[in-house]
Amino acid sequence: MKCLLIATGQHVPTWVAQGFAEYHRRLSYWLPLELVEIEPSMRGKNHDPQRAIEDEGRRVMAALPKQPYAVTLDVKGKPLNSEQLAQRMEHWRGLGRNLVFLIGGPEGHSQEVLNISNERWSLGPLTLPHMLVRLIVVEQLYRAATILTNHPYHRGK
């Protein structure tokens, strides 16, 4: 199974890149994850948000492997606690398909991307910078892996 994190945005702040690298390294023992960065559309005072969403959506679609199981990060998705995410991860690994997590740009995902999603996952009602979401996602995937292996990292319940 191949696992991708497709994230719109490049040139992340150093502290995000460092945090991502640390959790990516830790996660690699349980779930090899490849980060694919999608070039964001140009934004300025006269930019058209819908056009940006559609352009980024086309780039995301082009980056997808064949027949992926797509989990889209979406504010309207299902919120999961850490234990629920661990259960979902166990389910996803059992599917035998390429697993893809999709993080959109500042305005979100195109309808085309939402339409191919098998699941939508919400990190909650907070508004988060999309660059920070990649760090949160990789940490939560690592936490889920540690729950599944009874590693002491997760100290819930």
From Swiss-Prot:
Record's catalysed reaction(s): pseudouridine(1915) in 23S rRNA + S-adenosyl-L-methionine = N(3)-methylpseudouridine(1915) in 23S rRNA + S-adenosyl-L-homocysteine + H(+)
Keywords: Cytoplasm, Methyltransferase, rRNA processing, S-adenosyl-L-methionine, Transferase
Keyword presence, Cytoplasm: yes
InterPro entries xref list: Alpha/beta_knot_MTases, RlmH-like, tRNA_m1G_MTases_N
EC number(s) stated in the UniProt entry for this protein: 2.1.1.177
Signal peptide bounds: none
Single GO term (MF): rRNA (pseudouridine-N3-)-methyltransferase activity
Gene3D superfamilies on file: 3.40.1280.10
Family classification: Belongs to the RNA methyltransferase RlmH family.
Summary of subunit composition and partner proteins: Homodimer.
PANTHER family according to UniProt: METHYLTRANSFERASE (PTHR33603), RIBOSOMAL RNA LARGE SUBUNIT METHYLTRANSFERASE H (PTHR33603:SF1)
HAMAP family according to UniProt: 23SrRNA_methyltr_H
Name of the molecule in the record: Ribosomal RNA large subunit methyltransferase H
Source organism (scientific name): Xylella fastidiosa (strain M23)
